């Protein structure tokens, strides 16, 4: 625990250095408000995943940056492992203003931003670098800006990584192997249709229900990035892992729009830059440790890692999903 606290301190220091231009906003040094330092605004951050997961790698790099740069006018409280609800609940809470900030996967967010369906399309990206180039550019920003229409504001894309299939029944190398398997997916119409097209029986389910449902045999498997598979202990109940890379699935840092507009220009810049700095660290972490997570799943939990997957067959199986959702998305554009 002591060692981990040093990690966050180092990240905060690095972020502080990167945030140099913000500190001199309008040529004015940051001045502390004694009352604000003694009575900071407490921001609760909830996620569905445990503290060791990539989301919290990002959040616990972002929060100290904001606290430091605002001289303690904001403080953060952490609520991991679905303590504040599922991902849709978290997004709804931020929209309603009962929470100020959260990090949510794209899967449940199409109800708040139809454009997010684009990002959820299967096999859309072939590499993380390709994904970063698109999402960090004008197209990605345009998609994020659509959240403003529903009372949310998106600061940045966070990282999940590529998702893999895991199940309790058998090795999966091709769509034919998925036939009859009940696979949990996020509450995303695109993801439901994609897994069904691949041959599975997709079951949309909020994350708090998943582990028990796997234990009881209500579902046969799930799909998640390797690190999430390890951190959420699905390694214990779904030992067959297929490296399908079927979704590149980012997350979004969301804040309440009305609250965001009430902030000073300086504070908005601090939050924005802190979100982007922590995003970059998350990406580095996942890029460096995803393979390690698979090795732990294989050696410690005796998971069987299937790398010889017929990706071309999976890509072909989901073509109808593209036809359906590209038509829907085009229909929403002026």
Positions of PLM-derived features:
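Short, low-complexity disordered leader/linker segments with a strong preference
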Residues: 1-42
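N-terminal secretory/targeting leader peptides
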Residues: 26-130, 139, 147-334
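Basic phosphate/pyrophosphate-binding loop/patch that engages nucleotide-derived ligands
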Residues: 143
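Short, Φ-rich (hydrophobic/aromatic) sequence segments
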Residues: 134-136
